[in-house]
């Protein structure tokens, strides 16, 4: 009985230790089960990589607005720098205008030319600053849109300018206006160029004088009447009056 009991105990122990691992049994062996879990771990790693890709895309999307903001800052800085330069230029022009004149260095004509030039620069600077401040469009048409550089360009520019100016030729102030205009625009010219312009105006003046003389001569010819004209007619009238007077005097002498 004891031997039987011992045999049963050994068999129970054997049965206890011979029980197979259900996990390994289901997995089809230790090695296969381990590979399966390792595969699942790799899937989890791939999922983590996908998250990393999403994070990188988000970071790129966040970086782009920062680039745009920096570009806007650069543009704003450029505008501010340009405004500072314009302001500095205006101050320099204003300072030069307020400086006392130096007659020992510049002639009166040169002083006038310098003042006109500085005034023009200041006006242009003020205009450009106003346009930039208020966002005015620089699109212009006609004579204001021209920027002549060649001979043909200046010829066309001259025609448009002539048409613009001569529309006021009926004004009482037109001649004085032209005199001042020609003097002002010729101040910066060289002597040789001034001589050419003077000669051209002299020739024009001579032609106008000839035309005026011819016109007066034609008017005189139209007023002449055949047979002595107006003077002859007056002479005849006086003769008739004298004949009448002579007859009256003869009658008086006969009466005496």
Swiss-Prot record:
Q: Whom does it interact with, and what assembly results? A: Component of the eukaryotic translation initiation factor 3 (eIF-3) complex, which is composed of 13 subunits: EIF3A, EIF3B, EIF3C, EIF3D, EIF3E, EIF3F, EIF3G, EIF3H, EIF3I, EIF3J, EIF3K, EIF3L and EIF3M. The eIF-3 complex appears to include 3 stable modules: module A is composed of EIF3A, EIF3B, EIF3G and EIF3I; module B is composed of EIF3F, EIF3H, and EIF3M; and module C is composed of EIF3C, EIF3D, EIF3E, EIF3K and EIF3L. EIF3C of module C binds EIF3B of module A and EIF3H of module B, thereby linking the three modules. EIF3J is a labile subunit that binds to the eIF-3 complex via EIF3B.
Please list the residues that carry the modification Phosphotyrosine. 252
Report the PTM annotation. Answer: Phosphorylated. Phosphorylation is enhanced upon serum stimulation.
Which gene underlies this protein?
EIF3J
- Region of interest called Disordered, as start-end residue ranges on this chain: 1-106, 214-243
**Cellular compartments per GO CC:** cytosol; eukaryotic 43S preinitiation complex; eukaryotic 48S preinitiation complex; eukaryotic translation initiation factor 3 complex
Protein name in UniProt: Eukaryotic translation initiation factor 3 subunit J
Record field: compositional bias (Acidic residues): 38-57
């Amino acid at each position: 009985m004891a031997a039987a009991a011992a045999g049963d105990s050994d068999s129970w122990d054997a049965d206890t230790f011979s029980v197979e691992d259900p996990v390994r049994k289901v997995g089809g062996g230790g090695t296969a089960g381990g590979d399966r879990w390792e595969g699942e771990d790799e899937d989890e790693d791939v999922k983590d990589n996908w998250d990393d890709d999403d994070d990188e895309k988000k970071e790129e999307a966040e970086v782009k607005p920062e680039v745009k903001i920096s570009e806007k800052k650069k543009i704003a800085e450029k505008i501010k720098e340009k405004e500072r330069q314009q302001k500095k230029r205006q101050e320099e022009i204003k300072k030069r205008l307020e400086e006392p004149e130096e007659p020992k260095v510049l002639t009166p004509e040169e002083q006038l030319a310098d003042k006109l030039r500085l005034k023009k620069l200041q006006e242009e600077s003020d205009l450009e600053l106003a346009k930039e401040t208020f966002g005015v469009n620089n699109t212009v048409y006609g004579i204001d849109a021209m920027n002549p550089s060649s001979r043909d360009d200046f010829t066309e520019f001259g025609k448009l300018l002539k048409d613009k100016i001569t529309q006021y030729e009926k004004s009482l102030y037109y001649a004085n206006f032209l005199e001042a205009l020609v003097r002002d625009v010729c101040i910066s010219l060289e002597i040789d160029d001034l001589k050419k312009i003077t000669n051209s105006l002299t020739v024009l003046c001579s032609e106008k004088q000839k035309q005026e003389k011819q016109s007066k001569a034609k008017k005189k010819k139209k007023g002449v009447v055949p047979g002595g004209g107006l003077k002859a007619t007056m002479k005849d009238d006086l003769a008739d009056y004298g004949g009448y007077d002579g007859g009256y005097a003869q009658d008086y002498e006969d009466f005496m």
